[in-house]
A protein has these predicted regions:
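Short beta->alpha connector loops
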Residues: 18-23, 64-65, 161-163
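A structural signal for short, well-ordered beta-strand segments and their strand-loop junctions
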Residues: 81-85, 127-132, 190-194, 238-240
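A short acidic (Asp/Glu
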Residues: 25-27, 48-50, 92-95, 139-145, ...
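C-terminal catalytic/acceptor-binding lobe
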Residues: 6-13, 20-24, 171-173, 177-264
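Short, well-formed alpha-helical segments that are part of the catalytic scaffolds
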Residues: 13-36, 40-51
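Short acidic, S/G/P-rich loop/turn micro-motifs used as interaction or catalytic elements
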Residues: 19-23, 45, 88-91, 136-138
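Conserved catalytic core of nucleotide-sugar-dependent glycosyltransferases
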Residues: 91-177
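Active-site-proximal specificity loops/subdomain of glycosyltransferases
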Residues: 39-84, 89-106
Length: 264
């Protein structure tokens, strides 16, 4: 079953990929729930509807397996779309200091951010857009509110229809690196609003929580993802050690180093 709902002009589809954890769904609490499509396998639609009768549940074929295939199905089905993780607890605005009330967006502002960035991406002529990968104030540079190159974190992935982008279903859990590198190859630029970032409710626990990517994400698959990424994109994909205040979660963490970004 696919989405047939009508949207007002200027409203981008906001899709929440989820699987196997209706009880852990949280993003609808920090956005306008009536704007969200919760995308789950067909076999789980009834379970999600029972747990969340007020939410709009969209089913995809059970044959669509893995986060890469799921994102590809969503992109092909919706076209212009913003995909947001199902475990988001807060939308942070990094222009405000820690402790300030305005640091976190209310549901209306969080939802409007998706619409605004979609329109800005179209005006700028990019196909991939997102927000900062970290809510740590240390990383925010006030003089660089937008970045036009780099890695777009999968927690907030915005795509515009008509691109040369497609997900590689061999990739188990690094699909955001794949799509960011492929975008750099084909389209050169993206749009990242560094003033905003997502805060999930579990911290760095993807491999420890149930459902979702925990079904496929483990150190062996992370290592294989790096091999696949390096096969296609060479030394633009590097293993990441301890860098500054960054916390190394596991040995197979990676980074995308776009060659021409060094000159900017």
């Amino acid at each position: 079953m696919t989405s047939t709902r009508k949207r007002k002009k200027g409203e981008v589809p906001i899709v929440i990929p989820s699987m196997g954890r209706p009880d852990l769904l949280n993003t609808h609490k920090v956005m306008l729930p009536e704007r969200l499509d919760i995308c789950v396998p067909d076999s789980e639609v009834e379970k999600y509807q029972k747990a969340h009768p007020d939410l709009f549940i969209v089913g995809h074929p059970d044959s669509v397996k893995g986060i890469s295939a799921k994102r590809q199905w969503i992109y092909e089905t919706y076209g212009d779309v913003v995909m947001i993780d199902d475990d988001i607890g807060k939308f942070a605005c990094l222009e405000y200091a820690v402790g300030e009330k305005s640091r976190f967006l209310d549901p209306t502002a969080a939802t409007s951010l998706c619409d605004r960035l979609t329109e800005e991406a179209k005006q700028f002529g990019v196909y991939l857009f997102g927000v900062s990968a970290s809510a740590v104030p240390h990383y925010y540079v006030s003089g660089l509110p937008y970045r036009t190159w780099g890695w777009v974190n999968g927690g907030f992935t915005g795509l515009i229809a008509g691109s040369k982008l497609a997900y590689n279903t061999e990739i188990a859990s690094s699909e955001d690196y794949w799509i960011s590198a492929l975008n750099a190859y084909h389209h050169r630029k993206c749009l990242i609003d560094t003033r905003y970032a997502l805060v999930d409710v579990f911290g760095n626990g993807t491999m420890k929580t149930k459902g979702g990517m925990s079904f496929t994400r483990n150190l062996e698959r992370e290592s294989r993802d790096i091999e696949i990424l390096q096969r296609f994109f060479g030394d633009a994909i590097k293993r990441r050690g301890r860098m500054g205040v960054a916390h190394q979660i596991h040995e197979h963490q990676k980074m995308l180093e776009i060659p021409w970004a060094k000159m900017m």
